Amino acid sequence: MPKTMHFLFRFIVFFYLWGLFTAQRQKKEERTEEVKIEVLHRPENCSKTSKKGDLLNAHYDGYLAKDGSKFYCSRTQNEGHPKWFVLGVGQVIKGLDIAMTDMCPGEKRKVVIPPSFAYGKEGYAEGKIPPDATLIFEIELYAVTKGPRSTETFKQIDMDSDRQLSKAEINLYLQREFEKDEKPRDKSYQDAVLEDIFKKNDHDGDGFISPKEYNVYQHDEL
């Protein structure tokens, strides 16, 4: 084999093996990275835990692991009302979807989320969350209800069977769900939740949520 061809062959083999080594190392790193969960408080009575597709109501604070600086606080948004979101459908970062699975209403957790389950190499919010940042969240879960996106639930809310959800119908549904939760909430809280639902889902602004609008999951920033 001519020297030039021999060198080229060795060159190709080297980079092929290097590529395999790099890919295996990346897979190993992905396997070793995981969301770490510390349960700070768990109620003694827990008849229902959160699962994919459930509608959750929670507050959470976010910190950068490297220096402990706070970058997010849900209590500073929506007049301090807890956030509503559906678990496991990408409305929050993947790490939070994992961290909030199998939680009881009233449970508190502290979780550590590696970059691969957060914002990765890109970072977020114009440098507020830098690239490759490990994040810490302190979470308090208030309520777990059946996810609102199933056909069955749509039919339950749609009392007059006109295939659209009015504010009155959704308001009644929320009232029933809050009563099941057995935690006192004033009318202003329920009104705020109702307003938020229509703000995120009534895309054509007609005052109703259609089946199409109902089945569109919104992606929140955090």
Curated annotation (Swiss-Prot):
Reaction(s) catalysed (UniProt annotation): [protein]-peptidylproline (omega=180) = [protein]-peptidylproline (omega=0)
EC number: 5.2.1.8
GO CC term, one of those recorded: endoplasmic reticulum lumen
Keywords assigned: Calcium, Endoplasmic reticulum, Glycoprotein, Isomerase, Metal-binding, Repeat, Rotamase, Signal
Residues annotated to bind Ca(2+) 1: D158, D160, D162, Q164, E169
Family matches, as InterPro entries: EF-hand-dom_pair, EF_Hand_1_Ca_BS, EF_hand_dom, PPIase_dom_sf, PPIase_FKBP, PPIase_FKBP_dom
Record has Lyase as a keyword: no
PROSITE patterns named among the record's database cross-references: EF_HAND_1, EF_HAND_2, ER_TARGET, FKBP_PPIASE
Signal peptide as annotated in the record: 1-23
Residue positions with a glycan: N45
Chain positions recorded as Ca(2+) 2 binding sites: D202, D204, D206, E213
Superkingdom: Eukaryota
Motif range (Prevents secretion from ER): 219-222
Pfam family, one: FKBP_C
Subcellular location field: Endoplasmic reticulum lumen
EF-hand domain ranges (all copies): 145-180, 189-222
Stated role: PPIases accelerate the folding of proteins during protein synthesis.
Extra remark beyond the main annotation: Binds calcium.
Cited PANTHER family: PEPTIDYL-PROLYL CIS-TRANS ISOMERASE FKBP7, PEPTIDYL-PROLYL CIS-TRANS ISOMERASE FKBP7/14
Protein name: Peptidyl-prolyl cis-trans isomerase FKBP7
Organism (species): Pongo abelii
Gene this protein is translated from: FKBP7
